[in-house]
Amino acid sequence: MAIQLAPVQRPRMIRAMRFSSKTVGLASAVITVLIWTGFIVIARASASRGLLPLDIAFARVLGASAVLLPWAWWLMRPARQAGQQVGSLWGLSPLPLRPTVQTGVLGGFLYAILAYTGFFYAPASHASVLMPGSLPLWTTLLAWLFLREKVSAVRAVGLGFIVLGDVLVGGASLLMAFDGGEVWKGDLLFMAAGLCWASYSVMVRRHGFDAVRATMAITAFAFVCFVPLFIVLVG
């Protein structure tokens, strides 16, 4: 059942600020690049200091849960007070159970484990190219397959350059594999992580989920399923 939320009243100063869609888009792109860069650098540094992929993922889940789970609980409070059955996972996720599991597996568990494991084999420079660089490729292919989106000629040329860049970065590591190198393993893991995130993005777009609620669902799934598993396995 869809939840009708009252519009949030923004402060007067914020309402008075007017930005063009281009400005908002450019600012969002810059912030996204900074977040991706920070994620890659911190993950690589954590891997080089002896933390296992499960350890890094555990820290990621705890940090996100501390912020998003109380927010999700507050977000669904009006519906609960109205006697509506909302969300799943004991009120931690704002989405129904099935999409919560789907988003949690693709955008949460698999993505994190594949990406963090890749840092144990390949340098951060490879991750910065292969993970965010492959996202447009995977997303376009999945959107064409499941959403029936058309691929223009200009877009196809751009995707071709992405493939060329991935080959230039990952091809050298494949050649080094004959000499016992293991960088190629990390490269493949980075590409697989990008595929998981692209699958999550296309699924969210296909079902029209709100980005904030989808992120909350990822966190709720990881908190309920991954944290107990980590405690049992690692202690």
Protein language model regions, located:
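Cytoplasmic-side transmembrane-helix entry/capping segments in multi-pass membrane proteins
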Residues: 25-30, 96-104, 151-163, 209-220
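Hydrophobic transmembrane alpha-helices of multi-pass small-molecule transport proteins
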Residues: 68, 154-173, 219, 223-226
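Hydrophobic residues within membrane-embedded alpha-helical segments of Major Facilitator Superfamily
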Residues: 28, 34-35, 63, 106-110, ...
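Loop-to-transmembrane alpha-helix entry segments
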Residues: 131, 148-168, 180-186
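Specific alpha-helical transmembrane segments that line the substrate/conduction pathway
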Residues: 55-66, 115-150, 193
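Specific transmembrane alpha-helical segments of multi-pass solute transporters/efflux pumps
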Residues: 35-40, 73-80, 86-131, 140, ...
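Hydrophobic alpha-helical transmembrane segments in multi-pass integral membrane proteins
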Residues: 111-116, 167-179, 223-235
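Glycine-/small-residue-enriched transmembrane alpha-helix faces in small-molecule transporters
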Residues: 3-59, 175-206, 221-228
